C-alpha cells in the first residue's frame, strides 16, 4: 500500500457520487477539498465520522473546504447512507476502487485477529492546485471536523 503523501499530485480518476453524477479529479480544480475515505457506509465508526463532518459542515465550508466521502459501497448504499443521515456533501461510490487505490488507502488490515484487505480510514486535504496539503491517518471518528479545523488556526 503506497499512500499519497504531502506534496503529491492527486491521480486522475472518474467515478460517480450517491446521486449518479460523474465526479473526476477535475471537479476538485481550484477548490480546497477534504476527501475522506471510510471502510463501509452505515457502520458505527463511519456513521460517527460522517455525522461529525455533517454537524460541522458550515464551519468547514467557512474555512474554504469542499467535502467528499469515499468508500467502495455501491451508489445505492451511498444514497441510502446520505439520505438516512442528511449529508450535505457527496459520497463517492468507488466500487472499482479506482480512487481508493489511486490514493493508496486499500491494503491489509487486522480485525479480531483476522487479516484481510480493506479501506484504511484516512483523510486527505487537497490544495486548489491538486496537490496533497495534509494527510490525516489517525482519524478520530467522533471529532474528525476538529482534527481538520485545528490545523487552520
Language-model features and meaning:
Residues 1-153:
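Chalcogenol-based redox active-site neighborhoods
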Amino acid at each position: 500500500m503506497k499512500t499519497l503523501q504531502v506534496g503529491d499530485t492527486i491521480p486522475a480518476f472518474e467515478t460517480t457520487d450517491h446521486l449518479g453524477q460523474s465526479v473526476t479529479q477535475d471537479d476538485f480544480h481550484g477548490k480546497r477539498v477534504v476527501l475522506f475515505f471510510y471502510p463501509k457506509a452505515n457502520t458505527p465508526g463511519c456513521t460517527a465520522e460522517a455525522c461529525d463532518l455533517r454537524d460541522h459542515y458550515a464551519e468547514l465550508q467557512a474555512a474554504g473546504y469542499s467535502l467528499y466521502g469515499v468508500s467502495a459501497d455501491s451508489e445505492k448504499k451511498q444514497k441510502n447512507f446520505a439520505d438516512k443521515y442528511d449529508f450535505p456533501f457527496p459520497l463517492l461510490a468507488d466500487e472499482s476502487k479506482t480512487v481508493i487505490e489511486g490514493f493508496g488507502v486499500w491494503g491489509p488490515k487486522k480485525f479480531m485477529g483476522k487479516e484481510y484487505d480493506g479501506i484504511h480510514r484516512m483523510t486527505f486535504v487537497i490544495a486548489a492546485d491538486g496537490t496533497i496539503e495534509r494527510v490525516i491517518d489517525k482519524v478520530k471518528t467522533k471529532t474528525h471536523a476538529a482534527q481538520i479545523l485545528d490545523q487552520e488556526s
